[in-house]
């Protein structure tokens, strides 16, 4: 009986300790990992492409791409000039130049790409192949993003250079419900 009780107490203690360890790890991931490269709280995906500058928030162009042989899609983020919602430096401390292309650390690891390598990917809408040279890596261990300027991202997608399909903001916006997907 004593052995069974001692074994039960040991198993219970192990379960409790495992729970504390997992909680700490998940707290670190949720508070540090998911927000490591983005600084906005709200992303509104629009039903249709719009052009220019939105009245509220900041314009963003997003488009999904496939990398051959990989199951994880690449999301290109077309960032507006002087954006306050995206990183401004690479892991190496270099300033981001929105005329170039940068990968998040998760994307770099997933696709096996380093700074200076060429990344080949295809637009999932028209299967057109694109090749870009990666100028740096941005720390973000949860998102497979390709960061570039809005003009570059729209050119990859074959739409007008002033187009956007998302609005991002730190605060909730009052947008027309018919505009938002």
Language-model segments: residues:
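Short, strongly hydrophobic transmembrane alpha-helices
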Residues: 2-25
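Basic-flanked hydrophobic alpha-helices used for secretion and membrane insertion
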Residues: 24, 28-181
């Amino acid at each position: 009986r004593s052995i069974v009780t001692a074994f039960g107490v040991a198993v219970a203690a192990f379960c409790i300790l495992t729970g504390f360890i997992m909680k700490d790890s998940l707290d670190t991931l949720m508070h540090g990992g998911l927000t490591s490269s983005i600084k906005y709280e709200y992303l509104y995906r629009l039903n249709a492409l719009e052009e220019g500058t939105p009245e509220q928030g900041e314009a963003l162009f997003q488009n999904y791409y496939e990398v051959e042989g990989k199951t994880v899609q690449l999301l290109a983020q077309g960032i507006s000039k002087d954006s306050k919602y995206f990183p401004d430096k690479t892991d190496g401390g270099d300033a981001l130049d929105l005329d170039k292309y940068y990968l998040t650390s998760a994307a770099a690891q997933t696709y096996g790409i380093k700074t200076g390598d060429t990344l080949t990917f295809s637009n999932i809408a028209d299967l057109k192949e694109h090749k870009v040279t990666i100028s740096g890596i941005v720390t973000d261990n949860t998102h497979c993003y390709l960061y570039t300027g809005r003009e570059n991202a729209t050119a990859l997608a074959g739409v007008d250079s002033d187009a956007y399909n998302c609005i991002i903001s730190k605060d909730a916006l009052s947008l027309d419900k018919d505009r938002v997907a």
